[in-house]
A protein has these predicted regions:
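Short beta-strand-to-loop elements that line the ligand-binding cleft
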Residues: 14-16, 37-38, 92-95
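N-terminal beta-strand motif that seeds the catalytic metal site of vicinal oxygen chelate
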Residues: 1-26, 35, 50-52, 66-68, ...
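Short, charged/polar, Gly/Pro-enriched secondary-structure boundary elements
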Residues: 51-55, 110-112
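Conserved acetyl-CoA-binding loop of GNAT-fold acetyltransferases
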Residues: 30-37, 86-88
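Vicinal oxygen chelate
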Residues: 1-7, 11-19, 44-47, 58-121
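Short glycine/proline-centered loop/turn elements that form peptide/ligand docking sites
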Residues: 23, 38-44, 95, 121
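Conserved active-site alpha-helix within GNAT-family acetyltransferase domains
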Residues: 22-30, 103, 112
Length: 121
């Protein structure tokens, strides 16, 4: 099978639709050191590490939260930043059976983020 993926993207690109897209973009920058800017007239293209996440304001589309697994350098510090930015802790950081250190938070828009530091396997 042959397909074309635009430069800088992956085959699958998650998209989150929320009421206040600008605030979610600010949250992502604060918590994950994301890059990219809020765009009011198109989906905002936000990068977390090597991945692209599209963030849209509700309107033509209804709100739709996401459940995402994100690898970071320091799961504890990233979870703490998320809590400081208004997220709710769903699971304290712990050592998973497969080796990742992972915590879980829900952001103010209902998105769930599993935040992990890779295991040493």
């Amino acid at each position: 099978m042959s397909h074309v993926v635009p430069a800088g993207r992956h085959t699958v690109t998650p998209r989150i639709v929320v009421e206040d897209a600008a605030a979610l973009v600010a949250f992502l920058k604060r918590v994950f050191d994301a890059t990219g800017e809020f765009q009011s007239d198109a989906p905002s293209q936000i990068r977390i590490g090597d991945s692209l996440l599209m963030v849209s304001k509700a309107g033509p589309r209804e709100t739709f939260p996401a459940f995402l697994y994100v690898y970071v350098e320091d799961a504890e510090a990233t979870c703490e930043r998320a809590l400081d930015a208004g997220a709710l802790s769903l699971e304290a950081v712990w050592e998973t059976p497969y080796g990742d250190r992972r915590g879980m938070v829900r952001d103010p828009w209902g998105n769930v983020w599993q935040i992990a530091t890779p295991g040493r396997r």
